[in-house]
C-alpha cells in the first residue's frame, strides 16, 4: 500500500467534491525533528493532513499555512504546504503534556490563522477561534465563515500515520445541501483503521458503494524543508557585522538551526568575512 498520497474524487450524481489523504513517511519526517510529546505528534499529523487537503483546493500556484496559537502549554503549531504537496511543520510547547490532551487544553484561549500566499497576487488570511473540541470542527467553522460552503472534514493521527477526508459542496448554482448532508452522514462513518490500512479506492467503495464516484490519479506528498546554508547566510547578513564579529570573538563560530528539520549550519570567522564581502542586493563583491 502506497502512503503519502492525496486523492481527489467527484460524485457524478451530486454537486459535491471530495478528497482523501494518507500520510506516513512525510509525517514521520516532521515529528522526527524534535522530541515531541505524543499529543503534539498527533496534532501535527492532523495539521499535516488538513494542510494537504486545503492545499488541494487552491486554484493557484503558491503556499498555504495553517497556524495555531494560544496561551496554553502549546504556544504554536504550524504546517506549511504548497500546490506541489510539499509540507513542513513545527510546534513549540512548554512543560509536560498528557498523551490524551485535547485541543483546548493544549492551546488554552487560542486561534487558528490560515494564510494563502499566491506566487502572483495578494495574500489572503483568515482567522477563527480555537473554540471547538477538535481541529476538524475549527476548520469547518473557517469554511463556513470564509466561503459559506457546507464542508465536512475528518482527521486522524497516531504515532505512525495520519490521514484525513474533505467533503464540500461545489460552488455551483442551486441548492445542493440535501445531497451534501446525505454524503456527509456517510463520510462521518469512516474509521481511523480504514484510512490507515486500506487503499483509497476501497475506502471510498465502503463509504459510498451506492454512489457514482469518480476517483482521480493520486498526487504524491513529500516533506520538504526550504532551509539551506545560503538562506542562513542571508539571515546573518541582516545583522550588523560588529555584532556578528563580537559573537565570533566570544564563541569562535555562529551556529544557526532550522526549527523545521533540525539541520544545523555553522559559520566561522572566514565564512562571516565572505558573507559580508558580498553586497546585500547586487550579489557582487565589494
Curated annotation (Swiss-Prot):
The residues the entry assigns to the signal sequence are none
Q: Which SUPFAM superfamilies match?
A: Hsp33 domain (SSF64397), HSP33 redox switch-like (SSF118352)
This molecule's function is given as: Redox regulated molecular chaperone. Protects both thermally unfolding and oxidatively damaged proteins from irreversible aggregation. Plays an important role in the bacterial defense system toward oxidative stress.
Which GO cellular component terms are attached? cytoplasm
Q: Does the keyword Metal-binding apply?
A: no
- Does the UniProt entry include the keyword Cytoplasm? yes
NCBIfam families xref list:
PRK00114.1
What keywords are assigned to this protein? Chaperone, Cytoplasm, Disulfide bond, Redox-active center, Zinc
For this protein's source organism, the top of the classification is: Bacteria, Pseudomonadati, Pseudomonadota, Gammaproteobacteria, Alteromonadales
Q: How is it modified after translation?
A: Under oxidizing conditions two disulfide bonds are formed involving the reactive cysteines. Under reducing conditions zinc is bound to the reactive cysteines and the protein is inactive.
Location(s), subcellular: Cytoplasm
Q: Name which cysteines form disulfide bonds.
A: 225-227, 258-261
Gene Ontology biological-process entries = protein refolding
Gene3D superfamilies the record matches: helix hairpin bin (1.10.287.480), Hsp33 domain (3.55.30.10), HSP33 redox switch-like (3.90.1280.10)
A molecular function annotated in GO for this UniProt entry is:
protein folding chaperone
- UniProt similarity note: Belongs to the HSP33 family.
> Could you identify this protein by its name?
33 kDa chaperonin
Q: What is its main location?
A: cytoplasm
Annotated organism of origin: Shewanella piezotolerans (strain WP3 / JCM 13877)
CDD domains linked to this entry:
Hsp33
